[in-house]
C-alpha cells in the first residue's frame, strides 16, 4: 500500500477517535449521584421506620452506612457565659461561633451574633422564638464563612444562608435555602424558588424532582431532617402522596 495512503488513513482514524471522545457525555464534578428509594408512605418520626417499595429499610441503609456515619452535623450547646445557645463552626477555616440572643431593644425578637474570639463580626435578626432554634449551620473554609439560620415570624418559616455577610436568598432569589454543608470539601445546600427545588454544589445549581424536602423539624420530627455526612446527604422528600428516601452524594469516595 502507498505509504502516503497509510499515513492518511492513520490520521483519519485518530481524528475519528478524538471526535468520538469529545462527543461522550461525562459527569461533571458539580453533579452528584442521586439514589432514590420510593416508599409505601411517609416515614415515622417517632420510630425512624420507613417502608421502601420492594425491599427493606435495612437493605437500603446498608448501602452507604459507613459513609452516612461520617456525620458533619452542627451541634448547639447552651452557654451561660455566652448568654444563650452557641454553635461552633465546622471546616478548616478560622474558628468562629454563632450565639443566639434575645434583643435588648425589642424582646422577644432574636438576634444571631457571629463571634471571632471576643469580637462580634456579624449580627442578624433571627425573627421570633419558635419550636426550632434559629442556629442551623456554621462553616468556615477557604477564607469564607457561611451561616444558616431559620428565620421565624407569624407568616414566615424560612431558611436563610449568609455567605461572608451576604444573604444568598436575596442575591439568588431563593424562597428558602437550607442544609448548608461542605460535601466532599465543596459548598452544598438545598434551595427553593417559585419554579421548584434544587441543590447547589461546587458553583452549580441542579434541579430536584420533588415538591418538598423535609427540614427544620423539631422534637421527634427532627429525625426526618436531612442528615449531612462528609461525602453525602440523606433526606426524605415527597411529591403529592409519593414519598422517597434519598441519598445524594459523591459515592466514589465511599
Predicted segments, located by residue:
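Non-catalytic tandem-repeat scaffold regions and their flanking low-complexity/translocation tails
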Residues: 27-254
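Bacterial N-terminal signal peptides that target proteins for export
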Residues: 1-8
Amino acid at each position: 500500500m502507498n505509504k502516503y495512503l497509510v499515513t492518511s488513513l492513520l490520521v483519519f482514524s485518530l481524528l475519528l477517535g478524538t471526535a468520538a471522545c469529545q462527543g461522550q457525555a461525562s459527569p461533571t464534578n458539580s453533579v452528584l449521584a442521586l439514589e432514590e428509594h420510593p416508599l409505601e408512605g411517609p416515614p415515622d418520626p417517632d420510630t425512624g421506620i420507613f417502608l421502601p417499595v420492594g425491599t427493606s429499610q435495612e437493605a437500603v441503609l446498608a448501602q452507604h452506612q459507613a459513609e452516612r456515619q461520617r456525620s458533619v452535623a452542627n451541634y448547639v450547646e447552651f452557654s451561660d457565659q455566652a448568654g444563650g445557645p452557641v454553635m461552633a463552626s465546622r471546616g478548616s477555616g478560622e474558628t468562629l461561633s454563632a450565639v443566639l440572643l434575645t434583643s435588648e431593644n425589642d424582646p422577644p425578637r432574636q438576634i444571631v451574633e457571629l463571634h471571632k474570639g471576643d469580637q462580634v463580626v456579624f449580627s442578624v435578626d433571627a425573627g421570633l422564638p419558635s419550636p426550632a432554634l434559629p442556629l442551623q449551620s456554621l462553616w468556615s473554609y477557604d477564607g469564607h464563612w457561611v451561616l444558616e439560620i431559620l428565620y421565624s415570624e407569624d407568616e414566615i418559616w424560612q431558611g436563610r444562608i449568609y455567605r461572608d455577610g451576604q444573604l444568598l436568598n436575596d442575591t439568588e432569589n431563593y424562597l428558602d435555602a437550607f442544609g448548608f454543608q461542605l460535601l466532599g470539601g465543596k459548598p452544598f445546600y438545598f434551595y427553593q424558588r417559585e419554579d421548584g427545588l434544587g441543590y447547589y454544589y461546587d458553583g452549580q445549581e441542579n434541579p430536584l424532582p420533588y415538591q418538598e424536602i423535609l427540614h427544620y423539624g423539631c422534637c421527634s420530627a427532627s429525625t426526618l431532617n436531612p442528615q449531612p455526612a462528609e461525602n453525602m446527604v440523606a433526606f426524605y422528600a415527597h411529591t403529592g402522596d409519593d414519598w422517597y428516601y434519598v441519598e445524594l452524594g459523591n459515592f466514589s469516595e465511599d
